[in-house]
Amino acid sequence: MHAVTRPTLREAVARLAPGTGLRDGLERILRGRTGALIVLGHDENVEAICDGGFSLDVRYAATRLRELCKMDGAVVLSTDGSRIVRANVQLVPDPSIPTDESGTRHRSAERAAIQTGYPVISVSHSMNIVTVYVRGERHVLTDSATILSRANQAIATLERYKTRLDEVSRQLSRAEIEDFVTLRDVMTVVQRLELVRRIGLVIDYDVVELGTDGRQLRLQLDELLGGNDTARELIVRDYHANPEPPSTGQINATLDELDALSDGDLLDFTALAKVFGYPTTTEAQDSALSPRGYRAMAGIPRLQFAHADLLVRAFGTLQGLLAASAGDLQSVDGIGAMWARHVRDGLSQLAESTISDQ
């Protein structure tokens, strides 16, 4: 076996989505009630496990794939899937590679996928299902109607999560303006941002598997998730326990730690607080915090991050920025009179609109 870069399961599923030539070929095979074994890639590693059959090297077509799969052997496609390289070959992967599959075709498919690193598809004629194996992972293709039903339910859940996220975000913004933020307020928003991100990933996988059938779902998902990644980054910039504004490396490390939390830990505010560098006691949740101001200034139109960063480093906190006059802001090296007035007006409008939303 060779440690080389190969397609991920997600990439393989995308190649088999409705609207693709491969999916058309698989649908024809299923309708014909015949089995199939298809290798999605060709190199010396694949050649090493191929026995018998014949070489073709012809342009891929769904009808050709269907006809060639009527024979007992496997079909090998080029790495980009544009050509059919070999047909009716017997795959003889290393029998010592462990597999949990029971059927001969599925066992060969899983072992071949692990040994070569290329996706291998097994079509069961008895169960009428398509399974794709990629480097020790397996995925059973599902019909679009079933996926759409599941994804629409997930979208409804995402909409509820997003509504709740918007509510707690507004509450945090009001607390920031009034200088009454607690660690619990911040962790509530962090939790909701992460919940939205996670269910979004689940739906995104369904969208990938749906292919052309998932276009409308993609539009809905993009609209609901718009700005979520930026919001996660901004809240880390504002509230990381580091005495100085966190570096890009610290921000990425914090977000990675959040991503790695279990669903159970995500419900525990003390676990979230630990990721941000705060004490993990329940009492600490009521401790007062002061935002740096990145999140608030992100709401000022046309304000570049470089300018916001200069101001945060000069004034330290959002309250310091709110108390500063245009002249104070202009005194910061790199902030001209025009930007100083723009920021001063933007912060004033932000404070007024936030309070009026109560």
Swiss-Prot record:
InterPro entries: DisA, DisA_sf, DNA_integrity_DisA_N_sf, DNA_integrity_scan_DisA_link, DNA_integrity_scan_DisA_N, DNA_integrity_scanning_protein, RuvA_2-like. Participates in a DNA-damage check-point. DisA forms globular foci that rapidly scan along the chromosomes searching for lesions. Residues 6-144 form the DAC domain. It comes from the Bacteria. This is DNA integrity scanning protein DisA. ATP binds at G73, L91, T104, R105, H106, R107, S108. GO terms for molecular function: adenylate cyclase activity; ATP binding; diadenylate cyclase activity; DNA binding. It comes from Mycobacterium bovis (strain ATCC BAA-935 / AF2122/97). Gene3D superfamilies: 5' to 3' exonuclease, C-terminal subdomain (1.10.150.20), DNA integrity scanning linker region (1.20.1260.110), DNA integrity scanning protein, DisA, N-terminal domain (3.40.1700.10). Keywords: ATP-binding, DNA damage, DNA repair, DNA-binding, Magnesium, Nucleotide-binding, Nucleotidyltransferase, Transferase.
